[in-house]
Amino acid sequence: MASMANEKVYIHEFIDIIGHNRANYMHHMTANWSPIAQVERQQLCYGVWGTVGTTRRWPEVVNLWEEDGFEGLASSFRHEFNHPTLQDPALSAWWARAQQFRRAGVDRVLVPAPWTRTIEELCADGVTGETYAHELFQLRPGTAWEFLELVRTQGIPVLERFGWQLIGAFATAMRNDSEVILLWSIPTWEQWGACEAAQRGDSALVEWKHQMSSLALDWERCLLVDSPLCPLRTGRQPSESDRDSFQLPD
């Protein structure tokens, strides 16, 4: 768990990829965008992942960006939107390149549970996974923070038995405290499979789902895989020196 309360906020993105451009898009975001954002906006890359298409819509990428609280996010919004085009003019070439790889996206602003580790803490702890479970919960209005506390006290011990580690727990901002996103690191594909196989037969898992149902109206889980420059794979932030590690198409 985090040693200090996490006061960051996060931008979460589901990105719809055009054709066979997922690898191109992931490199464009990590190597070509993140180093700029780190300097100009104090924004860190928490993660860029590809979704496992068997478990969700495809082709798709999930981005998660760490902002320096709402004050930092407000400053970033000013930097981006206080222009006639509603885009930073200095990034026009970057935007033009990005649109070759992705069609559209759906974003959320997330507020972390205070005990959720920042990306720098996760990297310092050596957290990684062969895959990750991304869970999206729709809750009774007003119960997001109660649900996160239930996850902390009851859910974590259940999933840890299968080797799953909770690395992100977030409530969605700008709505009625009715949505939560959880992110679990899973060391091996087999540990994911073992947990899924036990969903109806393991008494602790069955009880945990019963407890969740007291607050959750519905939820869905998909799997993610690190992009090559994802900090949870490399243990560091993407840098300009990474730009030559992958050749984008002309």
Locate the predicted segments by residue:
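Extreme N-terminus of proteins, especially the signal/transit-peptide cleavage junction
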Residues: 1-8, 126-128
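An amphipathic, aromatic/His-enriched active-site/gating alpha helix that lines ligand/cofactor pockets
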Residues: 2-5, 23-47, 53-58, 66-109, ...
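Residues that flank catalytic or metal-binding motifs in active/ligand-binding sites
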Residues: 9-11, 59, 103, 131-133, ...
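Surface-exposed interaction/gating patches
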Residues: 12-24, 112-190, 228-250
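The conserved glycine-aromatic submotif of the RRM
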Residues: 53-62, 175-181
